Amino acid sequence: MHISKLPAALLIFSVALNHLKATPVRSGTNHQMDKRKCNTATCATQRLANFLVHSNNNLGPVLSPTNVGSNTYGKRSAAEIPDGDSLDLFLL
């Protein structure tokens, strides 16, 4: 992205974030869980990315929307969690 396009991109980003509002989905007579209101930065960024993908933006390449749930954020795989033995090396 060129430097001259950066202020325009930031302006569009701030306007889009101001217009994004999370509304809970109303459940009918069945006992389904309502959709959580999304106030986290990760969720807002995800919603902005989906908004830009579905709109006709000319800021960059068209990326496909990601389909991840709210349970994905903040999760680690077991391979990333350090074990206690590797932490002992830092104490030496």
Swiss-Prot record:
The gene is IAPP. GO terms for molecular function: hormone activity; receptor ligand activity. SMART domains: CALCITONIN (SM00113). Gene3D superfamilies: 6.10.250.2190. This is Islet amyloid polypeptide. The mature protein is largely unstructured in the absence of a cognate ligand. Residues 1-22 form the signal peptide. One of its GO terms (cellular component) is extracellular space. It is found in: Secreted.
